[in-house]
Amino acid sequence: MAGPGEYFAIGAYVSCRTCQETRLQGEVVAFDYPSKMLALKCPSSSGKANHADILLLNLDYVSDVEVINERTQTPPPLASLNITKLASRARLEKEEKLSQAYAISAGVSLDGQQLFQTIHKTIKDCKWQEKNIVVMDEVVISPPYQVENCKGKEGRALTHVCKIVEKHFRDVENQKGVQRNPVAQSQKETSTSS
């Protein structure tokens, strides 16, 4: 194990034995001396050639650590991060969470919240306006959020949103039917297969 002042170089290949007597070998991808945590990149347990397992090892529970191959050249540079893209993604995630929180605090029913999430998966341009769902600034769905509660200018947008609402509630009903009576469902499947 790494003693005082010792460390594992990124890219080195090491072998160690865990407290469960399992032998692990892999390439060092990270090492934190204060916490004695070692991250190893090992061949994939799924057997896929282009995949790898990353194992985090607490060196307090590892013995017999041996450096098999020390890295001689400098490790490749880290990939650059697109800070603008990351900031945009974080902003969008925050807006979505705030929208969900708004719906809950406004007293929107669970059906309304679920419908909003279903619509939002397909059409990102949807928002809350008090207890109403506004889609693409063209369609307004008011409580109790059924197809007949969809209002807007006749056209493709209204038709599309109505289809999403209709499918959402059909899927919810199908889910309830399956959850209500799984025994009857399995008996029905058995009787039709015989």
From Swiss-Prot:
Question: Which compartment or compartments is the protein found in?
Answer: Cytoplasm
Keyword Cytoplasm part of the UniProt annotation: yes
Q: Could you tell me where the Polar residues compositional bias lies?
A: 176-194
Molecular function (GO) terms listed?
A: RNA binding
Sm domain spans which residues?
A: 1-71
* Region annotation Disordered: where it falls in the sequence: 175-194
Q: List the disulfide bonds.
A: none
**Which stretches make up the AD domain?**
79-173
Q: Does the keyword RNA-binding apply?
A: no
| Top-rank lineage group of the source organism | Eukaryota
Pfam families membership: AD, LSM12_LSM
Chief location category: cytoplasm
Q: Name one GO cellular component term.
A: cytoplasm
Give the record's keywords alphabetically. Answer: Cytoplasm
Job of this protein: Nicotinic acid adenine dinucleotide phosphate (NAADP) binding protein.
As for family, the record states:
Belongs to the LSM12 family.
State the protein's name: Protein LSM12
